[in-house]
Every structure is written in C-alpha cells, then in structure tokens.
Amino acid sequence: MDKSLWIDSIDKMQSFPKLDENKKCDVCIIGAGILGLTCAYYLTRLGINTIILEKDEIGKKATGHSSAKITSQHGLMYSYLKNSFDNKYAKNYLEANQKAIENIKNIIKEEKINCDFEYKTNYVYITQKSEINKIKKEVELTNELGIKSYFITQSNLPFKIEGAIAFPDQAQFNPAKYLNGLIKSIIKTDKSKIYTNTTVTDVKKANMNM
C-alpha cells in the first residue's frame, strides 16, 4: 500500500514536523486522515486550540488508498440495521450519512477546495440470481426510509450482473486534494497545529474540571 492514485495526482501533500517537545492544547486528535482533520476543522472554527498527531505522513494510509466515494450506501446495510435494531435506527443512519455528504459539499464550497467533487449514483450489485430478493427488499426499505433508490438489471460493468440497487445523489472526489484543502483551512488561523511522524504510545486519564 505504498502507492496511492490520489497522492500521486497532486503536486505535493503538505508536510509537517515531528512533535519533539511538550505541548498544551484544548483537544488532541490522534490521526490526520479525513476523520481526524474534519474534527480539527470544526474545532478550529470554534476557536478551540487543537493539536493533530499523525504517526506517518498525511494521506499515506486509509484516506490515500480509499475508493474516493462519499455515500450512505454500504452494502445492504439498511436491511441489516432494521433486522438488528429497528426502522428508526436505520433511518437515523441514512439521514446522518446523507447529511455528511452535504457537510463535505458545504466545506468544499466555503473553503473553495478544488477536489473534483461531483454527484454520482452509487450501486451495489449482485451476480447471483438467488440474491435478487435481498436487493429488492433493500430497495423497498430504503424508499420507506426516505431515499429514492431503485432496482436495475443493466450496467456498464465489464461483466454480467443479475441486478443492483442504485442510490442517487451520492458523490465522489479526490481525497488527497480535499485533505490539502482541509489542512489549509485548519492551519490558517494558527489556532491548531499538525505534527506528523509522531506515534502516540499511551493515553493517560486526568482529572478535568469543566
């Protein structure tokens, strides 16, 4: 996992020094992937002094090797959530993921991040006829939950499928470009600091008076 299509597509991912001295902050975030940097972005906007620690260079792990899709469709997740919990739980999951797509879009717009964001339809397909009913039940359920999914039998894939569930209004982007944009937004106020090649080996609990 050394090569990354996304990292290779940009001139340079921003680099940062190693933490080699004691520092104080309001919040310390471990990991500078999309999750960690998104948390840092919102905290910085609130004026909270934040330090982000990354054991490698930014974008070298999960984010740099991601599928680059931004979607609320994760396999046949909603049937699983309904069966394991209930409809309300499944609906909350859907709404949270759909809101996340819009949050990313809003960050891109507000911070003027050029990261090739575009809305797309996302698909989960099957190649076995025995699984068609599972797909159709997922379509029915997700429509009940509030997304206009639909069933298809034809695709542009280079192999035959028996069917697929399509989720409209999903998205894709270049995660490396997005990370660079997030970083610029985080460090421009000097409220937050990022340190790479810094491994966290232990976390100690402390008494906090809030």
Predicted regions and their residues:
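Helix-loop-beta segment of a Rossmann-like dinucleotide-binding subdomain
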Residues: 87, 114-124, 153-184
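Helical element adjacent to the flavin cofactor pocket in flavoenzyme catalytic cores
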Residues: 133, 141-143, 165-210
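Short phosphate-binding/catalytic loops that engage adenosine nucleotides
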Residues: 48, 147, 192
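Dinucleotide-binding Rossmann-like beta1-alpha1 core, especially the glycine-rich loop
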Residues: 73-152
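Extreme N-terminal leader/targeting segments of oxidoreductases
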Residues: 1-27, 45
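N-terminal Rossmann-like FAD-binding beta1-loop-alpha1 element of flavoenzymes
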Residues: 23-52
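Glycine-rich FAD pyrophosphate-binding loop
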Residues: 45-65
